[in-house]
C-alpha cells in the first residue's frame, strides 16, 4: 500500500468520544445554493420554478399600455458565456458576468368600438439583450471590477403578524397596552393598538391613528356583524314575570347562580344560589335535562342588545343593536309581549367591552363613509371620491402588485392565527384582518401569547439570491414605467420589442448593488478561514435592517433559539457586537430563509440513525437531549433522567419523553470557534477574541499544521477552495511547481471529456489584503489520487489541513520585564529559521493617458536622470522581474507633456538646434512609495486595441502562449497514449485479414499473420483503421470509433487553445482616455520583528517586545532552549485556561515526536517503533493501519511524526485531564508538565519549576511595518498650510494643546517656537529656513503663522472688519 496523503488524516490522534453521525454540510453552500436558486442557470426555461429571477420577470410582466391595446409579455431568459474567465477578470479589472437575453412577446389588440370585443391584430416575439448579470465563482464570491467581493446574508424580521405590549411604559398608570402589527415583504404596514381607555385604534403605514372599526367597516362589515363576530350572545326568555336564559355551557363557566336551580320534575335543588357554575354542576344540569336558568331582571339591565329588538306587531325598533338595556326598556319589552331577545355576553373580566366601546367612539356607519375617512387620513388635502377611495383601499392590502406578504409571511400568518389560506395567496384577505383583531382582543382578555421578536422563528435570512432578486425587481419596475410611456407615445404596431425595452435601469441597479451596497463587501482574504467565515456571516445591518445606533441590547443578545443555528461566540467587538453573527457549523438555510439545524430522532428512549433538520419554530416544544448524553451500545439512554432543552429551558427529562438529540457537541459554535481546542475551558469573551483573531492570521512562508487541533482543520481547508482538489480519480502524470497533470482512470471519464485533468496552480498571486496566495503540489508522479483528494496546498494549508500559525515551545515565566503587560519575548531562532516570515504582495499601477497637451508616454528615456536610476528598466520603460527595489526607485518610466511656457532666448536657440523634444516633458514616473522594499515578481502591460505593442508586452504574450501550448501538447499526448493503449489491447494477437504496408511499400503486417506491437508502432496512427481482422466481430468498428473520438477530442483541444491565444493577442478594453496601463507586483518579505502582534487561539494576544539571541533564552536540562517566553499573569485573570491544557497536550505530542526521532537515529527495529506507535494511539483502526504498512512505509510514517504526533481535541468533547496525563506519561514527561529551566545568560537554574509546552501561535495582520511612519518634509493642507496627518498622506505628528502645555512647563521656548511656526504653518519662515540650511546658517527667523490669516478671514466672513496693523514696535 503506497503511503499517500489520504492516510495523513488517520494520523491525528482523535480524542472525540462521540462517533460522527453526519458530515458537516459544505461550508459555503449558503452562498452557492442561494445564487443557484436565483439564476436557475442549468434548468431549461420551460422547467424553471417560479422563484428567483423567473419570479421577478413574471411579477412585472405583462406590461400593458394605458389604453390596454398592447401588452408586452415575458417568455423566458437565457444566459450566454462570460467574455472573460475569472483569472482574466482579476488581471484586467473586469466584472465576471454573463450577458443575459430575454425573450419577450409584443401582442397588439384591435378593439371593436361598438361592441368592445378585443381581437389579436399582431404578435411579435424577439430576444432582447438585457445587460450583464454577475456570476458567482466556484468559491461563492463575485468578481466586480477585478476585485473579489462577497455578498453577506442579511438577518431581518420575517414578514407576518407580530403581537407585543409596551410593558406598561406608555401610560402613567402602568397599564399594559397590547398592539399587533402586520408586516408584509413589501407594501403598507398595518398596526392595531389599544389606548389606556381600552379603545382599539388602527394605523396604516404609521400615519395618524383612527378607530379600528373604521377599517373593519371599510371591509364591508356592519356594526351588528362586527359585534356578533367578536362577542358571544346569550338568549333571554320572557314569560310574564318569569325570566330565564338559555344554558350555554361555554359561557356559564365564568358566571354565578342568582337563585337556586331546581329540577322541575323532582323539585331537587341542583345548584344553590350564589354558587359558581363548576364543570361538575354543569354536567349535573345536563343530566337532569335543564336548559333554562332562572334570572332576575337586574341581571339583564346594563347588558347590550346584540341585534335590534323589534316589536313584532308594529315593526318599531324598541332597542337598537349595541344599545344598553335599562329597566324602562325592559318593562317596555315585557309590555309589548316579546318572548325572547339576545344580549351580548360581556363581563369585563374574561370578555372586555373594548370593541363595543370602539364602535361608540367611531362616528362612521357605512362602508362608503369608512372608505372616504381612510382616504382622508392617507391623502390629507385631496378631495375624495368614492371611486378613488375604493381604489386606494384595494391597492393598500389586496393588490398583488402593491402588496406582497410572500410565502413566508402567509405561512407565519396561517401559523399564528390558525388559518388555512393557501400559500400562493400572498395578499391580505378580509378574514386575515378580522382574525388579527380577534387574536389581539383575546390577548387583552388574557388568552394567547405575545411574540418574541428575537426568536429565530421570527427572523429570517436573506441570502445573495434574494437580495439580488429585490434589486432586480426595483430595476424592472423603473423600466416598466419607461415602457408604458413609450407605448403610449408611439404607434405600437410599427414597433418591435427591442424598441420598447431599455435595460439600462436594470443594469444600473445591479451594478450599484454589487458596487456600493452595504452588504456587498470587499472579501476578507487574509487566510482561508477568514474567507469561509466571511461567506457564512449574517448581518442584521444593511438596507431594510437595523442601524447600529438604534439596535438595543435584546437584539444583540444570545437567544435560546440560536443553539445550533447562530454561533454565540463569534461576533465582532465594538459597536457591531451581536448585530453581525456567524452561522453554526451544521446550520443551513431552508427555502423560506429560516436557519435550520440537524437533530437525531429519538423514539421510545432509543436514538435512531435518522437525522432531520429543524427550524426554530419546528423544534418548539420538543425535548432535545445533548450530544454527549450517555448511551449504551444499542443507542438507549443509560440514565433515567437526561439533561435536555425544551422551549429555551434546560431541564432534566425522563428518557422516554425525549424526542430529539443533538448530532455533535460542536453543533452550537461556528467554524472559527470550532477550531479552538479546549474551547470549553475558556471564558467566552476570550474565546470571542480567539475566533476573531484566527481570521487575522497572516499566511506564513512555511505552513505548519497545529499539533493540537480539533479535527476541523481539514474540512475548512477543503471547503475554502484555496487548496486544489482532484476532480476525478486518476494517476499523476507530471508535476512541477506550477501545474499538475492527472490522467483520469478509464471508468471515470465520460465520452465528452478528454480523459486528462490539468491543474494550473496559482503562483504568488496577491490577495485582497496583500497577502500572498501560492499553491504547492503535495503529490508525486505515479501517485494514484481519488476524487476529492487534496493534490496541492494553498496559502495557510499543510498537507490539506488548515495551518494558520506555528507550533512553538513556550515557557510561562517572567523574563527581565520583557513580558510585562502581555508582551512576548521570542528567540532569534524563530526569525533565523523563517518560522514567522510571511510574503506580502503590493500592486502598483501606472496609467498613460491622452491629455489635452498631448499623449503621455511610457518609456525609459526620462529627462534629467542618470544611468544608475534607470539601470533596472528595460527599453519599454518597465522594471525587470527580479529587481530589488527600495523607496524612491522608478518602477515604470513615464513622461507627460508640459504646458506651453514662455521660453527664454537661450532656450529658443537650444530648441532650434536640437529639435523641440528637449524640455517640454516632465517626469511622472511610478516610484516605489516610502516603507516598501522588496523584489519585483511580475509586470503586466495592457494596451488599447490597435496600438503598437512594445517589446515587453510581446515577451509576456510569448510566455503565456508557451504555457498554453504546453497544456495543449500534454493533453493531446495523454489522450493519444490512452487511445493507443485501448487500440493495442483490441488488435495485438489478432490475425490480420489483409496485408498492411508502410509508406515505402514495405509489408509491415502480412495477411493471416498475428498482429504484434512492433508492427503497429511502424504504422502511423491515422492509418490503423486500414487494419482488418479476421474473425474478430466488430473490432474494425471499435477501432474506427476510438480513432474518431480521438480526432474529435484533439479538435476540441486545438479549438480551445486557438481561442485562448486569440484572446491573448487581442487588445484590451481600457477606460476612456487611457492609452496604456502597466501593473507592477512587488513581493515584500516580512520577518517577525519587535512590534508585530502575535496571538494564540484562546484570545491570548501580545506584541513582540524583544528578540533574544538563542543562547540567552532559558533552556531545559537537555540543553534545548525554549522559543517563546510568555507572562504567567496573563492567564488567571483572563480565565482562558484552554491555553494551558493545549500547552500540556502539545508538550506530550512534541515529546512523543522526540522519542520517535531518537528511535530513528538509533536505527531501532521497525517492530519497536510500531509497538510504541500502537501504544501511543491505542485505537483499533490505527493499530490495523500500522499493521498494514511494510517496513519502508512505517519508517516514512515515523519520519513524518518526528516533529510531533498531531492530536485532535474537538470542542466540548476534548481530551480529559486523565488523557493528557497519560499522553505526558507516554512521552516520558512529568505529569505536571513542569520542567527545570536554566537562565541562558548565567547558566543558573531558576528557583521554581516552569510550565513548558507547545502552543500554536499565530502572527496577526497588524504588522509594525505597516504602522511605523516618519516624516521630515511632505505635503501641507491647502487652507491651513499645516502638515497633513496619517501614514497614507505621509503626514506629520500632531502637536496638540496639551503637548504645548508640556513644552511650556519645561520652558523649552525655542523648541516650541519652532514647532508652532516653521515646522507647522509659517509659509514665509519655511522658505527662509530652507535658504538658511542651503547656505549653511543655522538660524531661525519665524514669520506669521498661516492660521492667524485663516482666523482673520473667518472673522471677516462674519462681517467683522478685522485687520492686522503692522508697524514698528514704538
From Swiss-Prot:
Keywords from the UniProt entry: DNA-directed RNA polymerase, Nucleotidyltransferase, Transcription, Transferase
Record-listed E.C. numbers: 2.7.7.6
GO BP terms: DNA-templated transcription
Keyword hit for Nucleotidyltransferase: yes
Keyword rRNA-binding tagged: no
A GO-annotated cellular component: DNA-directed RNA polymerase complex
Pfam family, one: RNA_pol_Rpb2_2
Enzyme class: transferase
Catalytic activity: RNA(n) + a ribonucleoside 5'-triphosphate = RNA(n+1) + diphosphate
Superkingdom: Bacteria
One Gene Ontology term of the molecular function aspect: ribonucleoside binding
PANTHER family associated with the record: DNA-DIRECTED RNA POLYMERASE I SUBUNIT 2
Family the entry assigns: Belongs to the RNA polymerase beta chain family.
Subunit structure, as described in the record: The RNAP catalytic core consists of 2 alpha, 1 beta, 1 beta' and 1 omega subunit. When a sigma factor is associated with the core the holoenzyme is formed, which can initiate transcription.
Function: DNA-dependent RNA polymerase catalyzes the transcription of DNA into RNA using the four ribonucleoside triphosphates as substrates.
NCBIfam families (alphabetical): PRK00405.1, rpoB
Protein name as annotated: DNA-directed RNA polymerase subunit beta
Organism per entry: Geobacter metallireducens (strain ATCC 53774 / DSM 7210 / GS-15)
Amino acid at each position: 500500500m503506497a503511503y499517500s496523503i489520504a492516510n495523513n488524516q488517520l494520523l491525528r490522534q482523535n480524542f472525540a468520544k462521540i462517533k460522527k453521525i453526519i458530515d458537516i454540510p459544505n461550508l459555503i453552500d449558503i452562498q452557492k445554493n442561494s445564487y443557484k436558486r436565483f439564476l436557475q442557470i442549468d434548468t431549461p426555461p420551460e422547467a424553471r420554478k417560479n422563484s428567483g429571477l423567473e419570479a421577478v420577470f413574471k411579477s412585472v410582466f405583462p406590461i400593458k399600455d394605458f389604453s390596454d391595446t398592447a401588452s408586452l409579455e415575458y417568455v423566458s431568459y437565457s444566459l450566454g458565456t462570460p467574455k472573460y474567465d475569472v483569472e482574466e477578470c482579476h488581471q484586467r479589472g473586469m466584472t465576471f458576468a454573463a450577458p443575459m437575453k430575454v425573450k419577450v412577446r409584443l401582442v397588439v389588440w384591435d378593439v371593436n368600438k361598438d361592441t368592445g370585443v378585443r381581437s389579436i391584430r399582431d404578435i411579435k416575439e424577439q430576444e432582447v439583450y438585457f445587460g450583464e448579470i454577475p456570476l458567482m465563482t466556484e468559491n461563492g464570491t463575485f468578481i466586480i471590477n477585478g476585485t473579489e467581493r462577497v455578498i453577506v446574508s442579511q438577518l431581518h424580521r420575517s414578514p407576518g403578524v407580530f403581537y407585543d405590549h409596551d410593558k406598561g411604559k406608555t401610560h402613567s398608570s402602568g397599564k399594559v397596552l397590547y398592539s399587533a402589527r402586520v408586516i408584509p415583504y413589501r407594501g403598507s404596514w398595518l398596526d392595531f393598538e389599544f389606548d389606556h381607555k381600552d379603545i382599539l385604534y388602527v394605523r396604516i403605514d404609521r400615519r395618524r391613528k383612527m378607530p379600528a372599526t373604521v377599517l373593519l367597516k371599510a371591509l364591508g362589515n356592519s356594526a351588528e356583524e362586527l359585534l356578533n363576530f367578536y362577542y358571544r350572545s346569550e338568549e333571554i326568555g320572557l314569560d310574564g314575570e318569569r325570566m330565564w336564559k338559555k344554558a350555554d355551557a361555554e359561557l356559564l363557566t365564568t358566571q354565578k347562580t342568582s337563585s337556586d336551580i331546581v329540577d322541575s320534575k323532582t323539585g331537587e335543588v341542583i345548584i344553590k344560589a350564589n354558587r359558581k357554575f363548576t364543570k361538575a354542576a354543569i354536567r349535573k344540569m345536563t343530566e337532569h335535562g335543564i336548559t333554562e336558568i332562572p334570572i332576575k331582571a337586574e341581571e339583564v339591565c346594563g347588558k347590550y342588545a346584540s341585534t335590534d329588538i323589534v316589536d313584532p306587531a308594529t315593526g318599531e325598533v324598541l332597542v337598537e343593536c349595541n344599545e344598553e338595556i335599562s329597566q324602562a326598556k325592559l318593562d317596555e319589552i315585557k309590555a309589548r309581549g316579546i318572548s325572547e331577545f339576545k344580549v351580548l355576553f360581556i363581563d369585563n373580566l374574561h370578555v372586555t367591552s373594548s370593541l363595543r366601546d370602539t364602535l361608540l367612539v367611531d362616528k362612521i356607519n357605512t362602508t362608503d363613509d369608512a372608505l372616504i375617512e381612510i382616504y382622508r387620513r392617507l391623502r390629507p388635502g385631496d378631495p375624495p371620491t368614492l371611486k378613488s377611495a375604493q381604489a386606494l383601499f384595494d391597492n393598500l392590502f389586496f393588490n398583488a402588485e402593491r402588496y406582497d406578504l410572500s410565502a413566508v409571511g402567509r405561512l407565519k400568518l396561517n401559523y399564528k392565527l390558525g388559518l388555512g389560506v393557501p400559500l400562493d395567496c400572498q395578499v391580505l384577505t378580509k378574514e386575515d384582518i378580522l382574525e388579527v383583531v380577534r387574536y389581539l382582543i383575546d390577548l387583552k382578555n388574557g388568552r394567547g401569547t405575545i411574540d418574541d421578536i428575537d426568536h429565530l422563528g421570527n427572523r429570517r435570512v436573506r441570502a445573495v439570491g434574494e437580495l439580488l432578486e429585490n434589486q432586480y425587481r426595483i430595476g424592472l419596475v423603473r423600466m416598466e414605467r419607461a415602457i408604458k410611456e413609450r407605448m403610449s407615445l408611439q404607434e405600437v404596431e410599427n414597433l418591435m420589442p427591442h424598441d420598447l425595452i431599455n435595460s439600462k435601469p436594470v443594469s444600473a441597479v445591479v451594478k450599484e448593488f454589487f458596487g456600493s451596497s452595504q452588504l456587498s463587501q470587499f472579501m476578507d482574504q487574509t487566510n482561508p478561514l477568514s474567507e469561509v467565515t466571511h461567506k457564512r456571516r449574517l448581518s442584521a445591518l444593511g438596507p431594510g435592517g437595523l442601524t447600529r445606533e438604534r439596535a438595543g441590547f435584546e437584539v444583540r443578545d444570545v437567544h435560546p433559539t440560536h443553539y445550533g443555528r447562530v454561533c454565540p461566540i463569534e461576533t465582532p467587538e465594538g459597536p457591531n457586537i451581536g448585530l453581525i453573527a456567524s452561522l453554526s457549523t451544521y446550520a443551513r438555510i431552508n427555502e423560506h430563509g429560516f436557519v435550520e439545524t440537524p437533530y437525531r430522532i429519538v423514539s421510545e428512549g432509543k436514538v435512531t440513525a435518522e437525522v432531520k433538520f429543524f427550524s426554530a419554530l419546528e423544534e418548539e416544544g420538543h425535548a432535545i437531549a445533548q450530544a454527549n448524553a450517555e448511551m449504551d451500545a444499542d443507542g438507549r439512554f443509560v440514565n433515567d433522567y437526561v439533561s435536555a432543552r425544551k422551549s429555551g429551558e434546560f431541564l432534566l427529562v425522563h428518557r422516554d419523553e425525549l424526542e430529539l438529540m443533538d448530532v455533535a457537541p460542536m453543533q452550537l459554535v461556528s467554524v472559527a470557534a470550532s477550531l479552538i481546542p479546549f474551547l470549553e475551558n475558556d471564558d467566552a469573551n476570550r474565546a470571542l477574541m480567539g475566533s476573531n483573531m484566527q481570521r487575522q492570521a497572516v499566511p506564513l512562508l512555511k505552513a505548519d499544521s497545529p499539533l493540537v487541533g480539533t479535527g476541523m482543520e481539514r474540512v475548512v481547508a477543503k471547503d475554502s477552495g484555496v487548496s486544489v482538489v482532484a476532480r476525478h480519480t486518476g494517476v499523476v502524470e507530471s508535476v512541477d511547481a506550477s501545474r499538475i497533470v492527472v490522467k483520469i482512470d478509464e471508468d471515470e471519464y465520460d465520452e465528452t471529456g478528454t480523459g486528462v485533468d490539468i491543474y494550473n496552480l496559482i503562483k504568488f498571486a496577491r490577495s485582497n489584503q496583500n497577502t500572498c496566495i501560492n499553491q504547492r503540489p503535495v503529490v508525486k508522479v505515479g501517485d494514484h489520487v481519488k476524487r476529492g483528494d487534496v493534490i496541492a496546498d494553498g496559502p495557510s494549508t499543510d498537507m490539506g489541513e488548515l495551518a494558520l500559525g506555528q507550533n512553538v515551545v513556550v515557557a510561562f515565566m517572567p523574563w527581565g520585564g520583557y513580558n510585562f503587560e502581555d508582551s512576548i519575548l521570542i528567540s532569534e531562532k524563530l526569525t533565523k529559521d523563517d518560522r514567522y516570515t510571511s510574503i506580502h504582495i503590493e500592486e502598483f499601477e501606472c496609467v498613460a493617458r491622452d491629455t489635452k497637451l498631448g499623449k503621455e508616454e511610457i518609456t525609459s528615456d526620462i529627462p534629467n536622470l542618470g544611468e544608475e536610476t534607470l539601470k533596472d528598466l528595460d527599453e519599454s520603460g518597465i522594471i525587470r522581474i527580479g529587481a530589488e527595489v527600495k523607496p524612491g526607485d522608478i518602477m515604470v518610466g513615464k513622461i507627460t507633456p508640459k504646458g506651453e511656457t514662455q521660453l527664454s532666448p537661450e532656450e529658443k536657440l537650444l530648441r532650434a538646434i536640437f529639435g523641440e523634444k528637449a524640455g517640454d516633458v516632465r517626469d511622472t514616473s511610478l516610484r516605489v512609495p516610502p516603507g516598501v522594499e522588496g523584489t519585483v515578481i511580475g509586470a503586466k502591460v495592457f494596451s488599447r486595441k490597435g496600438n503598437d505593442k512594445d517589446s515587453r508586452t510581446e515577451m509576456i504574450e510569448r510566455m503565456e502562449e508557451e504555457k498554453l501550448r504546453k497544456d495543449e501538447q500534454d493533453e493531446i499526448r495523454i489522450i493519444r497514449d490512452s487511445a493507443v493503449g485501448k487500440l493495442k489491447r483490441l488488435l495485438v494477437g489478432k490475425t490480420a485479414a489483409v496485408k498492411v504496408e508502410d509508406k515505402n511499400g514495405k509489408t509491415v503486417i502480412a495477411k493471416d499473420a498475428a498482429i504484434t506491437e512492433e508492427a503497429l508502432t511502424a504504422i502511423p496512427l491515422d492509418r490503423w483503421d486500414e487494419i482488418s481482422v479476421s474473425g474478430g466481430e466488430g473490432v474494425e468498428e471499435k477501432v474506427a470509433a476510438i480513432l474518431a473520438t480521438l480526432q474529435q477530442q484533439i479538435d476540441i483541444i486545438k479549438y480551445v487553445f486557438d481561442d485562448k491565444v486569440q484572446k491573448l493577442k487581442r487588445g484590451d478594453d481600457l477606460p476612456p482616455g487611457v492609452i496604456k496601463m502597466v501593473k507592477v507586483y512587488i513581493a515584500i518579505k516580512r520577518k517577525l520583528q519587535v512590534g508585530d502582534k502575535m496571538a494564540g487561539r484562546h484570545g491570548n494576544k501580545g506584541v513582540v517586545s524583544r528578540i533574544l539571541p538563542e543562547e540567552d533564552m532559558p533552556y531545559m536540562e537537555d540543553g534545548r532552549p525554549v522559543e517563546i517566553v510568555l507572562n504567567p499573569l496573563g492567564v488567571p485573570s483572563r480565565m482562558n485556561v484552554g491555553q494551558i491544557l493545549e500547552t500540556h497536550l502539545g508538550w506530550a505530542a512534541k515529546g512523543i515526536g522526540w522519542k520517535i526521532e531518537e528511535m530513528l537515529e538509533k536505527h531501532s527495529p521497525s517492530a519497536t517503533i510500531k509497538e510504541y506507535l500502537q501504544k501511543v494511539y491505542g485505537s483499533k483502526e490505527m493499530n490495523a493501519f500500522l499493521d498494514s504498512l511494510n517496513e519502508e512505509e512505517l519508517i516514512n510514517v515515523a519520519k513524518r511524526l518526528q516533529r510531533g504526533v498531531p492530536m485532535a481535541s474537538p470542542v466540548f468533547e476534548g481530551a480529559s485531564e486523565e488523557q493528557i496525563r497519560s499522553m505526558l506519561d507516554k512521552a516520558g514527561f512529568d505529569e505536571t508538565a513542569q520542567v527545570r529551566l536554566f537562565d541562558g545568560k548565567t547558566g543558573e537554574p531558576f528557583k521554581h519549576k516552569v510550565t513548558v509546552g507547545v502552543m500554536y501561535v499565530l502572527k496577526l495582520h497588524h504588522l509594525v511595518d505597516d504602522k511605523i511612519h516618519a516624516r521630515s518634509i511632505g505635503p501641507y493642507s491647502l487652507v491651513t498650510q499645516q502638515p497633513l496627518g496619517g501614514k497614507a498622506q505621509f503626514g506629520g505628528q500632531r502637536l496638540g494643546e496639551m503637548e504645548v502645555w508640556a513644552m511650556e512647563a519645561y520652558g523649552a521656548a525655542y523648541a516650541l517656537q519652532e514647532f508652532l511656526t516653521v515646522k507647522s504653518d509659517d509659509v514665509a519662515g519655511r522658505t527662509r529656513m530652507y535658504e538658511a540650511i542651503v547656505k549653511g546658517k543655522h538660524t531661525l527667523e519665524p514669520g506669521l503663522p498661516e492660521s492667524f490669516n485663516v482666523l482673520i478671514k473667518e472673522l471677516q466672513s462674519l462681517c467683522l472688519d478685522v485687520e492686522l496693523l503692522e508697524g514698528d514696535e514704538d
